[in-house]
């Protein structure tokens, strides 16, 4: 495996998820974020002490956006030909094998990635080795 290219430190401005208004009060209201649209809504009006709303200011650095802790960006791979696309970009991108790839094809993909020194994020998934 090739180490990732040098980059600025990855900084997440907020790791806590944004909660939907009153999702803590009612079971029927899911916690997944929805923008409040009511005319009197205190979250929409940004009252002090209410839930934070997602905004552009929480976005991460453009250089480190979508970057994994290893410093690579994920690239979805479905066959051996896709792995060969990463030959020149193995310091920037890491291969991630798609969920619908069979275990036989996975073994071929992993072998080719090793030859090209491409990092595979989920190399151990769905690959059984006999004991």
Swiss-Prot record:
- Where in the cell does this protein reside? Cytoplasm
Checking PROSITE patterns in the record gives: RIBOSOMAL_L32E (PS00580)
Enumerate the GO terms in the molecular function aspect: structural constituent of ribosome
Assign the protein's first listed, main location to one coarse class.
Answer: cytoplasm
Q: How does it assemble?
A: Component of the large ribosomal subunit (LSU). Mature N.crassa ribosomes consist of a small (40S) and a large (60S) subunit. The 40S small subunit contains 1 molecule of ribosomal RNA (18S rRNA) and at least 32 different proteins. The large 60S subunit contains 3 rRNA molecules (26S, 5.8S and 5S rRNA) and at least 42 different proteins.
> What family does this belong to?
Belongs to the eukaryotic ribosomal protein eL32 family.
Which protein, by its recorded name, is this? Answer: Large ribosomal subunit protein eL32
Encoded by which gene? crp-63
């Amino acid at each position: 495996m090739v180490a990732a290219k040098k980059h600025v430190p990855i900084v997440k401005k907020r790791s806590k998820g944004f909660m939907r208004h009153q999702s803590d009060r009612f079971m029927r209201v899911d916690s997944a974020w929805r923008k409040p649209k009511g005319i009197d809504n205190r979250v929409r009006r940004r009252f002090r002490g209410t839930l934070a709303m997602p905004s552009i200011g929480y976005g991460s650095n453009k250089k480190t956006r979508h970057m994994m802790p290893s410093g690579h960006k994920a690239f979805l791979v479905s066959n051996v030909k896709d792995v060969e696309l990463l030959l020149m970009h193995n310091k920037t991108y890491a291969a991630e094998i798609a969920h619908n790839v069979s275990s036989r094809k996975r073994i071929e993909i992993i072998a080719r990635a090793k030859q090209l020194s491409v990092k595979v994020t989920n190399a151990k998934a769905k690959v059984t080795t006999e004991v």
